[in-house]
Design a protein with these regions (language model features):
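N-terminal beta1-alpha1-beta2 submodule of the flavodoxin-like/Rossmannoid cofactor-binding fold
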Residues: 1-103, 163-174, 179-221
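Short coil/turn segments at secondary-structure junctions
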Residues: 7-8, 81, 117, 153-156
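Short beta->alpha junction loops
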Residues: 39-42, 148-154
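Short, glycine-/small-residue-rich phosphate/pyrophosphate-handling segment
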Residues: 92, 105-151, 158-160
Length: 221
């Protein structure tokens, strides 16, 4: 079992968000998973230019580090999403990475994978970031196990969150191992599946990769 953690804070080793992602990964490792941490802020990932090439070929033509990182995420069983709260949303580094995954959401490539989200804020708005990240993951077909955050303005908040983060890592491993189903998330998955089934069918003569992906999955029935 492999779990990958994505950190989108520009603070590097000093990042509070990195501390929480690392704590989740520690809990997952203790529960038996192999882990990897990716620093999206250090990675060379440019903006999506909306060329549509990934719809046709399955590969982004921009010559940077996105394809390699994304391949490792797709190969993992679980994903830990981590971003600081910037103006009640994710950091620019995280949004840039997410925006490069149009092919991923079209093809529901997180189907069968499990994830969770963490965030750190100066105030209480980290929950909005956690909900956003889990929402993105579910929209891509994944199952969200949970999420948490911390406020640096509240004494003891980070320490408490780190303890909970380790527990969340263990819970993530359990969910993957048992193939846990979250009934409340199924309507989201069905809605996304139907939406993109229609879209891919509509563009089947142009989006060869995506049409063949759906066909091979048996989702076009």
């Amino acid at each position: 079992m492999k779990i990958i953690g994505l950190v989108a804070s520009p603070h590097g080793e000093k990042s509070s968000t990195r501390r929480l992602v690392s704590a989740v990964l520690e809990g997952a490792k203790k529960a038996g998973a192999q882990i990897e941490l990716v620093d999206l802020a250090k990675a060379r990932i440019g903006y999506c230019v909306a060329c549509g090439t990934c719809y046709k070929t399955g590969v982004c033509p921009i010559p940077d580090e996105f394809n390699g990182i994304h391949a490792r995420v797709k190969a993992a069983d679980g994903v830990v999403w981590g971003s600081p709260d910037y103006f009640q949303s994710v950091s620019a580094q995280m949004k840039t990475y997410i925006d490069r995954q149009a092919d991923c959401i079209h093809c529901q490539m997180m189907d069968g994978k499990y994830g969770c989200a963490v965030s750190v804020a100066g105030g209480p708005s980290y929950l909005e970031v956690v909900e956003y990240l889990n929402g993105v993951f579910m929209a891509m077909g994944g199952s969200a196990v949970g999420g948490l955050g911390a406020s640096t303005s509240i004494p003891g908040s980070m320490e408490s969150a780190e303890i909970k983060a380790r527990d969340l890592g263990g819970e993530l491993v359990k969910s993957i191992a048992s193939r846990r189903v979250y009934p409340e998330q199924e309507p989201i998955h069905r809605e996304m599946r139907e939406r993109f089934k229609h879209l891919v069918n509509l563009n089947k003569d142009v989006w060869a990769h995506e049409f063949n992906f759906w066909k091979d999955k048996g989702w076009l029935q």
